[in-house]
């Protein structure tokens, strides 16, 4: 069953690395979309107020502030961590999709903020998966390789998104829909990674 650890340790590590590679590829594009689109659209398309711009800029930090409380709550759920990560990404995807229909800066910012706060909970949960699924002598190599791929894919995506938005700012709606699809892809690959529940 997806989300549960049932393989031998060697199989767990291999399966984790393979699906985490695909997860990081999708996630790199999603993160680049956040970084390249949100503030630019808020400023240039919606002519957002300073308050809205500040909230968007601090979305990730707001998410990190509530991470300890979030971990405490989900530790009681007894769900495998990969399933929780998948649920978070599906909810973030829906919020991003809704943002494509935004007609005001506050509505747009609210959707993006919710998506950002949900998405930034995932890295702390992935630490649990990496700790359980990789041996200590291979953990750094396997994690860093996938993160490097995410960074490379993300930088290329950010450049392409910048060109698109310079061409026509209204393309942010298409970008949001594409990001929605990639968030769902990230959620799917989370489900394929073996994991155990958090201990409260």
Predicted regions and their residues:
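Transmembrane alpha-helix termini and helix-breaking/packing motifs in multi-pass membrane transporters
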Residues: 39-45, 72-77, 100, 151-176
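Helix-loop boundary and gating motifs at the non-cytosolic
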Residues: 2-67, 71
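Hydrophobic core of transmembrane alpha-helices in multi-pass small-molecule transporters
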Residues: 25, 95, 105-123
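Intracellular juxtamembrane helix-capping segments at the cytosolic ends
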Residues: 120-134
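C-terminal ends and interior cores of transmembrane alpha-helices
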Residues: 87-104, 163-166
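Helix-loop junctions at membrane interfaces in 12-TM secondary transporters
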Residues: 15-17, 98-112, 168
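C-terminal membrane-cytosol helix-exit motif in multi-pass small-molecule transporters
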Residues: 180-199
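Glycine-rich segments within core transmembrane alpha-helices of 12-TM secondary carriers
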Residues: 61-68, 143-161
């Amino acid at each position: 069953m997806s989300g549960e650890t049932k393989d031998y340790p060697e199989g767990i590590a291999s399966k984790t690395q393979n699906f985490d590679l695909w997860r990081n590829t999708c996630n790199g594009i999603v993160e680049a979309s956040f970084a390249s689109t949100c503030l630019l659209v808020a400023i240039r398309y919606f002519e957002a107020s300073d308050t809205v711009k500040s909230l968007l800029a601090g979305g990730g930090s707001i998410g990190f502030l509530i991470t300890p409380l979030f971990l405490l709550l989900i530790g009681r759920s007894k769900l495998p961590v990969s399933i929780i990560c998948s649920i978070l990404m599906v909810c973030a995807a829906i919020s991003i999709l809704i943002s494509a229909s935004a007609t005001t800066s506050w509505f747009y910012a609210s959707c993006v903020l919710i998506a950002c706060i949900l998405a930034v909970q995932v890295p702390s949960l992935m630490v649990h998966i990496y700790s359980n699924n990789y041996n200590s002598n291979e953990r750094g190599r396997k994690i860093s390789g996938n993160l490097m791929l995410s960074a490379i894919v993300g930088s290329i995506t950010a450049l392409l998104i910048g060109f698109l938005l310079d061409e026509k700012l209204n393309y942010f709606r298409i970008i949001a829909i594409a990001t929605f699809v990639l968030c769902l892809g990230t959620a799917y690959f989370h489900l394929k990674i073996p994991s155990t529940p958090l201990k409260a």
